[in-house]
From Swiss-Prot:
InterPro entries according to UniProt: Chemokine_IL8-like_dom, Interleukin_8-like_sf
Subunit-level organization: Interacts with host CXCL12.
Superkingdom of the source species: Viruses
Listed GO biological process terms: immune response; symbiont-mediated suppression of host receptor-mediated signal transduction; symbiont-mediated suppression of host signal transduction pathway
Primary gene name: MC148
Disulfide partners: none
Name of the molecule in the record: Chemokine-like protein MC148
Organism whose genome encodes this protein: Molluscum contagiosum virus subtype 1 (MOCV)
Purpose: Plays a role in antagonizing the chemotaxis of multiple leukocyte subsets induced by CC and CXC chemokines. Displaces the interaction between CXCL12 and CXCR4 and thereby inactivates the antiviral activity of host CXCL12.
GO cellular component: extracellular region
Length: 104
């Protein structure tokens, strides 16, 4: 590849990464949405008191929209260590939250 080709491909990648007109941020994947920041680990310690809704994939990992008991919402992906540890320790509840439990 010549220098100009590399520059053009980088510019194209950057343009593709930008939000497109008419596509609301609400439709983007939860953990990539800047208005819906990931929930800090300390709030995930007792996940039996948190409502999880699977929302598809986030950067190649399963992602969940999370509603805490006080009504706050956020998101978390399966790459989060607190969530993985909890799922491993609650194999009976895991299938209700995530279809990928058999891989743990």
């Amino acid at each position: 590849m010549r220098g100009g080709d590399v520059f053009a491909s980088v510019v194209l990648m950057l343009l593709l990464a930008l939000p497109r007109p008419g596509v609301s941020l609400a439709r983007r994947k939860c953990c990539l949405n800047p208005t819906n920041r990931p929930i800090p680990n300390p709030l995930l310690q007792d996940l039996s008191r948190v409502d999880y809704q699977a929302i598809g994939h986030d950067c190649g990992r399963e992602a969940f929209r999370v509603t805490l008991q006080d009504g706050r919402q956020g998101c978390v992906s399966v790459g989060n260590k607190s969530l993985l540890d909890w799922l491993r320790g609650h194999k009976d509840l895991c299938p209700q939250i995530w279809s990928g439990c058999e891989s743990l």
